[in-house]
């Protein structure tokens, strides 16, 4: 879910074409959740193949990632590894929320309620099969992926800070806490999107957030930004009741990088806050990775999607033509640029 900084951070809208020839380290789990939540049937059920296996994420990867490649973007997907021990309670709580949402979805669906779609989205979860299938399809498409030693966003942030990528691609703001210099949002959902439960549509454009701009605007150090996030709530702690971003900002402005003083004023405690802060500042990351794009393998993609997962042959043929053309054009441009 990520930390809630939306009310304090002002992203800068860009056009997708501005990411041409830019490497984006995509938070894989975050993006898969988007695909699984958004790409659904009218009753809220995810897309599935003839055997009942969920395929919404595969649809998102083949069609929407192809859109990004056509714009000249160079995505590299970064998957989560082993989460830190203090994330266990969050993982457990989320599983309980999703199970409750699943039960409400089934009840709403049986009753023919319009609320079914909302509950279906809230029940979205990722299992090992979904992750494995995503990696297979990305590999066949020639899109590189990395498995982080711990949190994918931390690894992606590290890659951008080291110059191996230009942006972290994620809907969450956590990448900023991990030190990502630049984050781009909405790359996977750009275009017209229906407003939930309303018969209206809105334009969704990519948004860029730069860490130094955020710190300068808020008048904080990165350490203080992390303290503020911990007060509001992160992936590793629930935050303090009734302390939102604005209240947290005031407290950090008053006390600076002094969490004990803030907690003393509030009369509250936050379990593991020191370990959480240390993890944001010094997460487990690795230099043992390669970022290399390959050529798509149309025959393997077609077999995987059409024969194994019941995709339409005609639709897959069309998107494969687009993908191979886009990769070919990118290769030509790279070859030409080497002459100058």
UniProtKB/Swiss-Prot annotation:
Keyword Magnesium in annotation: yes
Domain of life of the native organism: Archaea
UniProt keyword DNA repair present: yes
Binding site for Mg(2+) 2: 172, 174, 235
Location of region: Interaction with PCNA: 332-340
Pfam families named among the record's database cross-references: XPG_I, XPG_N
Cofactor: how bound: Binds 2 magnesium ions per subunit. They probably participate in the reaction catalyzed by the enzyme. May bind an additional third magnesium ion after substrate binding.
Region (I-domain): 115-256
Keywords: DNA damage, DNA repair, DNA replication, Endonuclease, Exonuclease, Hydrolase, Magnesium, Metal-binding, Nuclease
Cofactor(s) the protein requires to work: Mg(2+)
GO MF entries: 5'-3' exonuclease activity; 5'-flap endonuclease activity; DNA binding; magnesium ion binding
Subunit structure: Interacts with PCNA. PCNA stimulates the nuclease activity without altering cleavage specificity.
Family: Belongs to the XPG/RAD2 endonuclease family. FEN1 subfamily.
Function according to Swiss-Prot or TrEMBL: Structure-specific nuclease with 5'-flap endonuclease and 5'-3' exonuclease activities involved in DNA replication and repair. During DNA replication, cleaves the 5'-overhanging flap structure that is generated by displacement synthesis when DNA polymerase encounters the 5'-end of a downstream Okazaki fragment. Binds the unpaired 3'-DNA end and kinks the DNA to facilitate 5' cleavage specificity. Cleaves one nucleotide into the double-stranded DNA from the junction in flap DNA, leaving a nick for ligation. Also involved in the base excision repair (BER) pathway.
PANTHER family for this protein: FLAP ENDONUCLEASE 1, FLAP ENDONUCLEASE FAMILY MEMBER
Xref: NCBIfam families: fen_arch (TIGR03674)
Protein name as it appears in the record: Flap endonuclease 1
Species classification: Archaea, Methanobacteriati, Methanobacteriota, Stenosarchaea group, Methanomicrobia
Originating gene: fen
